[in-house]
Swiss-Prot record:
Pathway: Carbohydrate degradation; glycolysis; pyruvate from D-glyceraldehyde 3-phosphate: step 3/5. Its cofactor is Mn(2+). One of its GO terms (cellular component) is cytosol. GO terms for molecular function: manganese ion binding; phosphoglycerate mutase activity. The gene is gpmI. It catalyses: (2R)-2-phosphoglycerate = (2R)-3-phosphoglycerate. The lineage of its organism: Bacteria, Pseudomonadati, Pseudomonadota, Alphaproteobacteria, Rickettsiales. GO terms for biological process: glucose catabolic process; glycolytic process. Transmembrane segments: none annotated. This is 2,3-bisphosphoglycerate-independent phosphoglycerate mutase. SUPFAM superfamilies: 2,3-Bisphosphoglycerate-independent phosphoglycerate mutase, substrate-binding domain (SSF64158), Alkaline phosphatase-like (SSF53649).
Length: 494
Protein backbone atom coordinates (compact mmCIF):
# COMPACT_ATOMS: atom_id res chain seq x y z
CA UNK A 1 0.00 0.00 0.00
CA UNK A 2 1.40 3.36 -1.02
CA UNK A 3 -1.68 5.34 -0.03
CA UNK A 4 -2.64 6.83 3.31
CA UNK A 5 -3.57 5.09 6.53
CA UNK A 6 -7.23 5.84 7.27
CA UNK A 7 -9.08 6.42 10.54
CA UNK A 8 -12.83 5.94 9.98
CA UNK A 9 -14.89 7.59 12.71
CA UNK A 10 -18.51 6.42 12.74
CA UNK A 11 -20.71 8.79 14.76
CA UNK A 12 -23.66 6.59 15.61
CA UNK A 13 -26.96 8.46 15.24
CA UNK A 14 -25.46 11.72 13.87
CA UNK A 15 -27.77 12.79 11.04
CA UNK A 16 -28.01 15.95 8.99
CA UNK A 17 -30.80 17.99 10.55
CA UNK A 18 -32.48 21.22 9.54
CA UNK A 19 -31.00 23.31 12.34
CA UNK A 20 -34.25 23.97 14.20
CA UNK A 21 -34.92 23.83 17.93
CA UNK A 22 -35.40 20.06 17.72
CA UNK A 23 -31.86 19.54 16.39
CA UNK A 24 -29.57 18.67 19.31
CA UNK A 25 -26.52 18.46 17.05
CA UNK A 26 -27.08 21.98 15.75
CA UNK A 27 -27.75 23.33 19.25
CA UNK A 28 -24.74 21.71 20.95
CA UNK A 29 -21.43 23.44 21.50
CA UNK A 30 -18.95 21.84 19.12
CA UNK A 31 -15.98 24.12 18.37
CA UNK A 32 -13.96 21.47 16.51
CA UNK A 33 -16.81 20.67 14.15
CA UNK A 34 -17.55 24.33 13.47
CA UNK A 35 -13.94 25.45 13.03
CA UNK A 36 -12.07 22.52 11.48
CA UNK A 37 -14.68 20.19 10.02
CA UNK A 38 -16.60 23.01 8.36
CA UNK A 39 -13.49 23.79 6.33
CA UNK A 40 -12.88 20.19 5.19
CA UNK A 41 -14.30 18.51 2.09
CA UNK A 42 -17.70 17.13 2.99
CA UNK A 43 -20.79 15.62 1.43
CA UNK A 44 -23.97 13.81 2.41
CA UNK A 45 -24.81 10.11 2.34
CA UNK A 46 -28.15 8.37 2.07
CA UNK A 47 -28.51 6.00 5.04
CA UNK A 48 -32.06 4.67 4.80
CA UNK A 49 -34.52 2.89 2.55
CA UNK A 50 -33.49 1.09 -0.60
CA UNK A 51 -30.03 2.69 -0.56
CA UNK A 52 -29.16 0.43 2.38
CA UNK A 53 -31.18 -2.61 1.35
CA UNK A 54 -34.33 -1.76 3.33
CA UNK A 55 -37.89 -1.12 2.14
CA UNK A 56 -38.47 2.33 0.66
CA UNK A 57 -38.86 5.00 3.38
CA UNK A 58 -37.70 2.61 6.14
CA UNK A 59 -35.36 4.39 8.55
CA UNK A 60 -31.83 3.12 8.82
CA UNK A 61 -30.31 1.53 11.90
CA UNK A 62 -26.92 0.66 13.32
CA UNK A 63 -26.77 -2.92 12.05
CA UNK A 64 -27.76 -2.00 8.51
CA UNK A 65 -25.54 1.07 8.54
CA UNK A 66 -22.42 -0.83 9.55
CA UNK A 67 -23.10 -3.66 7.11
CA UNK A 68 -23.39 -1.10 4.30
CA UNK A 69 -20.28 0.80 5.39
CA UNK A 70 -18.16 -2.34 5.52
CA UNK A 71 -19.58 -4.19 2.53
CA UNK A 72 -19.19 -1.47 -0.07
CA UNK A 73 -22.39 -2.58 -1.77
CA UNK A 74 -26.14 -2.47 -1.16
CA UNK A 75 -26.90 -5.64 0.80
CA UNK A 76 -30.50 -6.83 0.78
CA UNK A 77 -31.28 -6.69 4.48
CA UNK A 78 -33.09 -9.37 6.44
CA UNK A 79 -36.23 -7.22 6.74
CA UNK A 80 -36.56 -7.00 2.95
CA UNK A 81 -35.68 -10.65 2.49
CA UNK A 82 -38.20 -11.83 5.09
CA UNK A 83 -40.93 -9.53 3.79
CA UNK A 84 -40.42 -10.99 0.32
CA UNK A 85 -40.64 -14.60 1.52
CA UNK A 86 -42.97 -14.51 4.55
CA UNK A 87 -46.00 -15.20 2.34
CA UNK A 88 -44.60 -18.66 1.59
CA UNK A 89 -43.46 -19.36 5.16
CA UNK A 90 -46.02 -22.16 5.53
CA UNK A 91 -43.83 -24.33 3.30
CA UNK A 92 -40.51 -23.44 4.94
CA UNK A 93 -38.83 -26.80 5.78
CA UNK A 94 -37.30 -25.49 9.02
CA UNK A 95 -40.70 -24.28 10.25
CA UNK A 96 -42.40 -27.55 9.30
CA UNK A 97 -39.77 -29.61 11.13
CA UNK A 98 -40.12 -27.34 14.18
CA UNK A 99 -43.91 -27.67 14.12
CA UNK A 100 -43.82 -31.45 13.69
CA UNK A 101 -41.69 -31.84 16.83
CA UNK A 102 -44.18 -29.78 18.84
CA UNK A 103 -47.16 -31.78 17.57
CA UNK A 104 -45.45 -35.10 18.27
CA UNK A 105 -44.78 -34.03 21.85
CA UNK A 106 -48.21 -32.41 22.25
CA UNK A 107 -46.56 -29.20 23.35
CA UNK A 108 -47.21 -25.55 22.65
CA UNK A 109 -45.25 -22.99 20.65
CA UNK A 110 -43.76 -19.98 22.41
CA UNK A 111 -43.23 -17.09 20.02
CA UNK A 112 -41.08 -14.29 21.39
CA UNK A 113 -40.03 -11.08 19.74
CA UNK A 114 -40.41 -7.33 19.44
CA UNK A 115 -44.06 -6.32 19.06
CA UNK A 116 -43.48 -3.21 16.95
CA UNK A 117 -43.93 -1.80 13.47
CA UNK A 118 -40.57 -0.04 13.69
CA UNK A 119 -38.82 -2.67 11.58
CA UNK A 120 -35.44 -2.25 13.26
CA UNK A 121 -35.11 -5.44 15.33
CA UNK A 122 -38.32 -7.21 14.43
CA UNK A 123 -41.71 -6.64 12.86
CA UNK A 124 -45.12 -7.26 14.37
CA UNK A 125 -46.51 -8.61 11.10
CA UNK A 126 -43.96 -11.43 11.19
CA UNK A 127 -45.18 -12.47 14.65
CA UNK A 128 -48.78 -12.44 13.45
CA UNK A 129 -48.14 -14.45 10.29
CA UNK A 130 -45.98 -17.07 11.99
CA UNK A 131 -48.47 -17.46 14.84
CA UNK A 132 -51.36 -17.98 12.43
CA UNK A 133 -49.47 -20.52 10.32
CA UNK A 134 -48.64 -22.55 13.43
CA UNK A 135 -52.18 -22.26 14.78
CA UNK A 136 -53.52 -23.54 11.45
CA UNK A 137 -51.36 -26.62 12.07
CA UNK A 138 -53.41 -27.10 15.29
CA UNK A 139 -50.63 -25.93 17.59
CA UNK A 140 -51.41 -23.74 20.58
CA UNK A 141 -49.37 -20.52 20.36
CA UNK A 142 -48.28 -18.38 23.30
CA UNK A 143 -46.75 -14.99 22.53
CA UNK A 144 -44.08 -13.34 24.66
CA UNK A 145 -44.25 -9.75 23.50
CA UNK A 146 -41.28 -7.42 23.87
CA UNK A 147 -42.55 -3.84 23.96
CA UNK A 148 -40.62 -1.24 21.97
CA UNK A 149 -41.08 2.45 22.85
CA UNK A 150 -37.67 3.26 21.44
CA UNK A 151 -37.78 2.81 17.67
CA UNK A 152 -41.43 3.86 17.82
CA UNK A 153 -43.43 6.19 20.08
CA UNK A 154 -42.69 5.63 23.81
CA UNK A 155 -46.34 4.80 24.55
CA UNK A 156 -47.58 2.95 21.49
CA UNK A 157 -47.86 -0.57 22.93
CA UNK A 158 -51.64 -0.53 23.32
CA UNK A 159 -51.98 0.08 19.58
CA UNK A 160 -49.70 -2.86 18.82
CA UNK A 161 -51.43 -5.20 21.27
CA UNK A 162 -54.84 -4.26 19.86
CA UNK A 163 -53.63 -4.96 16.31
CA UNK A 164 -52.24 -8.32 17.38
CA UNK A 165 -55.41 -9.34 19.20
CA UNK A 166 -57.55 -8.32 16.23
CA UNK A 167 -55.37 -10.38 13.87
CA UNK A 168 -55.43 -13.60 15.91
CA UNK A 169 -58.72 -13.51 17.82
CA UNK A 170 -60.16 -16.49 15.93
CA UNK A 171 -57.10 -18.69 16.54
CA UNK A 172 -55.71 -20.53 19.56
CA UNK A 173 -53.20 -17.74 20.12
CA UNK A 174 -52.75 -15.61 23.23
CA UNK A 175 -50.26 -13.34 24.94
CA UNK A 176 -48.46 -15.11 27.80
CA UNK A 177 -46.02 -12.41 28.94
CA UNK A 178 -45.05 -8.86 28.09
CA UNK A 179 -41.69 -7.26 28.79
CA UNK A 180 -40.13 -3.92 28.00
CA UNK A 181 -37.19 -4.28 25.62
CA UNK A 182 -35.01 -2.70 28.33
CA UNK A 183 -35.19 -6.09 30.04
CA UNK A 184 -35.80 -8.62 27.26
CA UNK A 185 -33.41 -7.11 24.71
CA UNK A 186 -30.44 -5.90 26.75
CA UNK A 187 -27.11 -6.37 24.96
CA UNK A 188 -24.73 -4.81 27.48
CA UNK A 189 -24.38 -7.83 29.79
CA UNK A 190 -26.82 -6.37 32.35
CA UNK A 191 -27.87 -9.86 33.30
CA UNK A 192 -30.12 -8.64 36.09
CA UNK A 193 -32.37 -7.15 33.40
CA UNK A 194 -32.30 -10.29 31.27
CA UNK A 195 -33.01 -12.38 34.37
CA UNK A 196 -36.32 -10.58 34.98
CA UNK A 197 -37.46 -11.21 31.43
CA UNK A 198 -36.32 -14.84 31.55
CA UNK A 199 -38.15 -15.53 34.82
CA UNK A 200 -41.42 -14.19 33.41
CA UNK A 201 -41.07 -16.03 30.09
CA UNK A 202 -39.64 -19.37 31.21
CA UNK A 203 -40.87 -19.65 34.80
CA UNK A 204 -44.00 -17.44 34.89
CA UNK A 205 -42.57 -15.40 37.74
CA UNK A 206 -43.29 -11.71 38.06
CA UNK A 207 -46.26 -9.35 38.33
CA UNK A 208 -49.38 -11.05 37.00
CA UNK A 209 -52.26 -9.36 35.17
CA UNK A 210 -55.47 -10.66 33.66
CA UNK A 211 -54.55 -9.32 30.21
CA UNK A 212 -51.85 -7.36 28.41
CA UNK A 213 -53.83 -4.12 28.27
CA UNK A 214 -54.21 -4.09 32.04
CA UNK A 215 -50.48 -4.58 32.47
CA UNK A 216 -49.70 -1.72 30.10
CA UNK A 217 -52.21 0.62 31.74
CA UNK A 218 -50.79 -0.21 35.17
CA UNK A 219 -47.30 0.58 33.92
CA UNK A 220 -48.43 3.89 32.42
CA UNK A 221 -50.13 4.85 35.69
CA UNK A 222 -46.73 4.56 37.36
CA UNK A 223 -45.08 6.75 34.73
CA UNK A 224 -43.34 3.81 33.02
CA UNK A 225 -43.27 3.79 29.22
CA UNK A 226 -43.23 0.74 26.95
CA UNK A 227 -39.46 0.23 26.82
CA UNK A 228 -39.22 -0.07 30.59
CA UNK A 229 -42.34 -2.12 31.40
CA UNK A 230 -41.40 -4.66 34.06
CA UNK A 231 -41.66 -8.23 32.69
CA UNK A 232 -45.17 -9.40 33.54
CA UNK A 233 -47.14 -12.63 33.34
CA UNK A 234 -50.56 -12.66 31.68
CA UNK A 235 -53.55 -14.76 32.74
CA UNK A 236 -52.84 -18.28 33.96
CA UNK A 237 -49.59 -18.81 32.05
CA UNK A 238 -47.39 -21.39 33.84
CA UNK A 239 -44.04 -21.30 32.01
CA UNK A 240 -42.06 -23.59 29.71
CA UNK A 241 -42.60 -27.33 29.41
CA UNK A 242 -39.95 -29.72 27.97
CA UNK A 243 -42.29 -30.69 25.14
CA UNK A 244 -42.71 -27.09 23.96
CA UNK A 245 -41.01 -25.24 21.12
CA UNK A 246 -39.56 -21.72 21.11
CA UNK A 247 -39.59 -19.47 18.03
CA UNK A 248 -37.74 -16.14 18.11
CA UNK A 249 -38.92 -13.58 15.56
CA UNK A 250 -36.33 -10.81 15.90
CA UNK A 251 -34.24 -10.63 12.73
CA UNK A 252 -31.44 -8.55 14.22
CA UNK A 253 -29.04 -10.48 16.40
CA UNK A 254 -27.41 -8.04 18.80
CA UNK A 255 -30.38 -7.63 21.15
CA UNK A 256 -31.63 -11.21 21.14
CA UNK A 257 -28.52 -13.30 21.82
CA UNK A 258 -28.37 -12.46 25.53
CA UNK A 259 -31.81 -13.77 26.43
CA UNK A 260 -31.45 -16.65 23.96
CA UNK A 261 -28.19 -17.68 25.64
CA UNK A 262 -29.90 -17.61 29.03
CA UNK A 263 -32.72 -19.82 27.76
CA UNK A 264 -30.24 -22.28 26.26
CA UNK A 265 -28.26 -22.54 29.49
CA UNK A 266 -31.11 -22.54 32.01
CA UNK A 267 -33.94 -24.25 30.14
CA UNK A 268 -31.98 -27.07 28.58
CA UNK A 269 -34.99 -29.36 28.71
CA UNK A 270 -36.54 -27.25 25.93
CA UNK A 271 -34.48 -28.30 22.93
CA UNK A 272 -36.78 -27.39 20.05
CA UNK A 273 -35.72 -23.80 19.35
CA UNK A 274 -35.89 -21.93 16.05
CA UNK A 275 -34.69 -18.43 15.15
CA UNK A 276 -35.78 -16.11 12.39
CA UNK A 277 -32.13 -15.76 11.28
CA UNK A 278 -28.78 -17.06 12.48
CA UNK A 279 -28.01 -15.03 15.58
CA UNK A 280 -24.44 -16.14 16.19
CA UNK A 281 -21.89 -18.59 14.83
CA UNK A 282 -21.44 -19.72 18.44
CA UNK A 283 -25.13 -20.42 19.08
CA UNK A 284 -26.20 -23.53 17.18
CA UNK A 285 -29.89 -22.80 16.68
CA UNK A 286 -31.51 -23.47 13.28
CA UNK A 287 -33.03 -20.50 11.47
CA UNK A 288 -35.89 -19.90 9.07
CA UNK A 289 -33.65 -17.76 6.90
CA UNK A 290 -30.05 -19.05 6.79
CA UNK A 291 -27.25 -16.47 6.48
CA UNK A 292 -25.86 -15.11 3.24
CA UNK A 293 -22.16 -14.94 2.47
CA UNK A 294 -20.88 -11.37 2.13
CA UNK A 295 -17.32 -11.69 0.88
CA UNK A 296 -14.60 -9.13 0.20
CA UNK A 297 -15.76 -6.58 2.73
CA UNK A 298 -13.44 -3.68 3.50
CA UNK A 299 -11.81 -5.51 6.40
CA UNK A 300 -11.26 -8.66 4.36
CA UNK A 301 -9.70 -6.73 1.46
CA UNK A 302 -7.33 -4.88 3.80
CA UNK A 303 -6.40 -8.17 5.48
CA UNK A 304 -5.69 -9.87 2.14
CA UNK A 305 -3.20 -7.08 1.42
CA UNK A 306 -1.25 -8.12 4.52
CA UNK A 307 -2.10 -4.90 6.36
CA UNK A 308 -3.05 -4.41 10.00
CA UNK A 309 -6.35 -2.93 11.10
CA UNK A 310 -8.06 -2.01 14.36
CA UNK A 311 -11.72 -2.05 15.37
CA UNK A 312 -12.56 -0.16 18.56
CA UNK A 313 -15.86 0.69 20.28
CA UNK A 314 -17.51 0.62 23.66
CA UNK A 315 -19.71 -2.32 24.60
CA UNK A 316 -22.96 -0.97 23.16
CA UNK A 317 -21.55 -0.76 19.63
CA UNK A 318 -18.78 -3.35 19.68
CA UNK A 319 -20.74 -5.84 17.57
CA UNK A 320 -21.33 -3.16 14.98
CA UNK A 321 -17.67 -2.38 14.24
CA UNK A 322 -16.79 -6.08 14.29
CA UNK A 323 -19.55 -8.57 13.36
CA UNK A 324 -21.74 -6.27 11.25
CA UNK A 325 -18.92 -4.25 9.66
CA UNK A 326 -17.35 -7.57 8.63
CA UNK A 327 -20.52 -8.77 6.90
CA UNK A 328 -21.64 -11.15 9.65
CA UNK A 329 -18.27 -12.76 10.38
CA UNK A 330 -17.51 -13.06 14.09
CA UNK A 331 -13.82 -13.96 14.02
CA UNK A 332 -11.22 -11.25 13.29
CA UNK A 333 -9.49 -11.28 9.93
CA UNK A 334 -5.72 -11.94 9.97
CA UNK A 335 -4.03 -8.75 11.09
CA UNK A 336 -7.19 -7.39 12.74
CA UNK A 337 -7.01 -6.22 16.36
CA UNK A 338 -10.07 -5.44 18.44
CA UNK A 339 -10.54 -3.26 21.51
CA UNK A 340 -13.73 -3.13 23.55
CA UNK A 341 -14.22 -0.40 26.16
CA UNK A 342 -16.91 -1.18 28.77
CA UNK A 343 -19.96 1.07 28.57
CA UNK A 344 -20.88 2.77 31.86
CA UNK A 345 -23.20 0.88 34.20
CA UNK A 346 -26.12 3.32 34.33
CA UNK A 347 -29.81 2.62 33.80
CA UNK A 348 -30.12 5.10 30.91
CA UNK A 349 -27.36 7.00 29.17
CA UNK A 350 -28.79 10.47 29.72
CA UNK A 351 -27.43 9.97 33.25
CA UNK A 352 -23.92 9.79 31.78
CA UNK A 353 -23.99 11.35 28.29
CA UNK A 354 -20.24 11.06 27.85
CA UNK A 355 -20.58 7.27 28.13
CA UNK A 356 -17.07 5.84 27.63
CA UNK A 357 -16.01 8.18 24.85
CA UNK A 358 -13.06 9.73 26.67
CA UNK A 359 -11.31 6.53 27.85
CA UNK A 360 -11.95 5.01 24.42
CA UNK A 361 -10.37 8.02 22.74
CA UNK A 362 -7.30 7.75 24.96
CA UNK A 363 -6.74 4.19 23.73
CA UNK A 364 -7.54 5.20 20.16
CA UNK A 365 -5.01 8.04 20.18
CA UNK A 366 -2.31 5.68 21.47
CA UNK A 367 -3.06 3.21 18.68
CA UNK A 368 -3.03 5.93 16.01
CA UNK A 369 0.28 7.28 17.25
CA UNK A 370 1.78 3.77 17.15
CA UNK A 371 1.45 3.92 13.34
CA UNK A 372 1.00 0.15 13.16
CA UNK A 373 -2.45 0.20 11.54
CA UNK A 374 -3.39 0.95 7.95
CA UNK A 375 -7.10 1.08 8.82
CA UNK A 376 -8.78 2.00 12.08
CA UNK A 377 -12.56 1.85 12.52
CA UNK A 378 -14.04 3.49 15.63
CA UNK A 379 -17.66 3.97 16.69
CA UNK A 380 -18.82 6.79 18.95
CA UNK A 381 -22.14 5.64 20.40
CA UNK A 382 -23.25 8.78 22.24
CA UNK A 383 -25.50 10.55 19.73
CA UNK A 384 -27.55 7.39 19.23
CA UNK A 385 -27.64 5.90 22.71
CA UNK A 386 -28.32 9.20 24.47
CA UNK A 387 -30.59 10.28 21.62
CA UNK A 388 -32.87 7.34 22.36
CA UNK A 389 -33.57 8.76 25.83
CA UNK A 390 -35.29 11.85 24.41
CA UNK A 391 -33.37 14.11 26.82
CA UNK A 392 -32.37 17.16 24.76
CA UNK A 393 -29.88 18.64 27.22
CA UNK A 394 -28.16 15.29 27.72
CA UNK A 395 -27.87 14.80 23.96
CA UNK A 396 -26.35 18.26 23.55
CA UNK A 397 -23.74 17.31 26.14
CA UNK A 398 -23.12 14.03 24.32
CA UNK A 399 -22.50 15.91 21.07
CA UNK A 400 -20.02 18.22 22.81
CA UNK A 401 -18.17 15.19 24.17
CA UNK A 402 -17.92 13.66 20.70
CA UNK A 403 -16.65 16.96 19.34
CA UNK A 404 -13.88 17.09 21.95
CA UNK A 405 -12.92 13.49 21.17
CA UNK A 406 -12.82 14.16 17.44
CA UNK A 407 -10.41 17.01 18.06
CA UNK A 408 -8.04 14.59 19.83
CA UNK A 409 -8.38 12.00 17.06
CA UNK A 410 -7.77 14.68 14.43
CA UNK A 411 -4.59 15.84 16.15
CA UNK A 412 -3.28 12.28 16.51
CA UNK A 413 -4.09 11.39 12.90
CA UNK A 414 -2.41 14.54 11.64
CA UNK A 415 0.69 13.79 13.69
CA UNK A 416 0.78 10.21 12.36
CA UNK A 417 0.16 11.24 8.76
CA UNK A 418 -3.18 9.42 8.62
CA UNK A 419 -6.33 10.51 6.83
CA UNK A 420 -9.43 10.91 8.99
CA UNK A 421 -12.85 10.15 7.52
CA UNK A 422 -15.94 11.04 9.58
CA UNK A 423 -19.40 9.69 8.86
CA UNK A 424 -22.44 8.14 10.58
CA UNK A 425 -24.64 5.08 10.20
CA UNK A 426 -28.07 6.72 10.50
CA UNK A 427 -29.80 9.76 11.94
CA UNK A 428 -31.20 10.24 15.44
CA UNK A 429 -29.89 13.14 17.52
CA UNK A 430 -30.82 15.76 14.92
CA UNK A 431 -34.52 15.24 15.68
CA UNK A 432 -35.47 15.25 19.34
CA UNK A 433 -39.17 16.18 19.11
CA UNK A 434 -42.01 15.47 16.71
CA UNK A 435 -44.43 18.03 15.28
CA UNK A 436 -46.53 17.90 18.47
CA UNK A 437 -43.56 18.62 20.69
CA UNK A 438 -43.47 15.04 22.00
CA UNK A 439 -40.00 13.55 22.58
CA UNK A 440 -38.90 11.69 19.45
CA UNK A 441 -36.65 8.76 20.38
CA UNK A 442 -36.50 6.85 17.10
CA UNK A 443 -34.08 6.94 14.18
CA UNK A 444 -34.64 9.23 11.22
CA UNK A 445 -34.38 8.83 7.46
CA UNK A 446 -32.14 11.88 7.14
CA UNK A 447 -28.84 11.81 5.30
CA UNK A 448 -25.60 11.64 7.28
CA UNK A 449 -22.35 13.58 6.83
CA UNK A 450 -19.14 12.42 5.20
CA UNK A 451 -16.10 14.55 6.05
CA UNK A 452 -12.51 14.15 4.83
CA UNK A 453 -9.78 15.48 7.14
CA UNK A 454 -5.97 15.46 7.06
CA UNK A 455 -5.76 14.24 3.47
CA UNK A 456 -2.39 15.08 1.92
CA UNK A 457 -3.95 15.12 -1.55
CA UNK A 458 -6.44 17.65 -2.87
CA UNK A 459 -9.77 15.86 -3.05
CA UNK A 460 -13.37 16.94 -2.95
CA UNK A 461 -16.34 14.74 -2.06
CA UNK A 462 -19.60 14.13 -3.87
CA UNK A 463 -22.85 12.91 -2.34
CA UNK A 464 -23.53 9.19 -2.25
CA UNK A 465 -24.68 6.27 -0.12
CA UNK A 466 -23.21 4.45 2.86
CA UNK A 467 -22.02 1.69 0.54
CA UNK A 468 -19.72 4.20 -1.17
CA UNK A 469 -17.57 4.69 1.93
CA UNK A 470 -15.56 1.46 1.60
CA UNK A 471 -14.59 2.17 -2.05
CA UNK A 472 -13.65 5.70 -0.99
CA UNK A 473 -11.35 4.34 1.72
CA UNK A 474 -9.76 1.87 -0.68
CA UNK A 475 -8.96 4.69 -3.08
CA UNK A 476 -7.37 6.68 -0.26
CA UNK A 477 -5.30 3.60 0.61
CA UNK A 478 -4.55 3.01 -3.10
CA UNK A 479 -5.97 -0.51 -2.98
CA UNK A 480 -7.97 -1.89 -5.90
CA UNK A 481 -11.69 -2.23 -5.29
CA UNK A 482 -12.92 -5.85 -5.60
CA UNK A 483 -15.64 -6.71 -8.10
CA UNK A 484 -18.10 -7.50 -5.29
CA UNK A 485 -18.08 -3.86 -4.17
CA UNK A 486 -20.62 -2.10 -6.37
CA UNK A 487 -20.35 1.17 -4.47
CA UNK A 488 -18.26 4.00 -5.93
CA UNK A 489 -15.50 6.17 -4.54
CA UNK A 490 -16.81 9.63 -3.70
CA UNK A 491 -13.44 11.34 -4.11
CA UNK A 492 -13.12 13.97 -6.82
CA UNK A 493 -9.91 15.83 -7.71
CA UNK A 494 -9.90 19.51 -6.83
Amino acid sequence: MSGSAVVLCILDGWGNGNGDECDAIHAARKPFWESVVSGCPRSSLSASGEDVGLPAAQVGNSEVGHISLGAGRVVLQDLQRINAEIGEIHSNPYLLQFAEAIKNGRGVCHIMGLLSDGGVHGLQDHITQLARVLAELRIKVLIHAFLDGRDVSPRSAKKHVTALNDAVHSYDISIATISGRYYAMDRDHRLDRTEKAYEAIALARGPRYRDAMTAIESSYSEGISDEFLVPSVIGDYQGFSPKDGILLTNFRSDRIVQILSMILHRSQEVSNILGMVRYSEKIQVPSLFPPRNICNTLGEVVSKCGLKQLRIAETEKYAHVTFFFSGGKEEPFPGEDRVIIPSPQVSTYDLQPEMSAFPMTEVLVERIESRQYSLIVVNYANADMVGHTGNLEAVKKAISVIDACLQMVFNAAKKAGATMLITADHGNAEKMFDMRGTPFTAHTSNTVPLVLCNCDKRFGLVDGRLCDVAPTILELMEIAKPDEMTGSSLLTPE
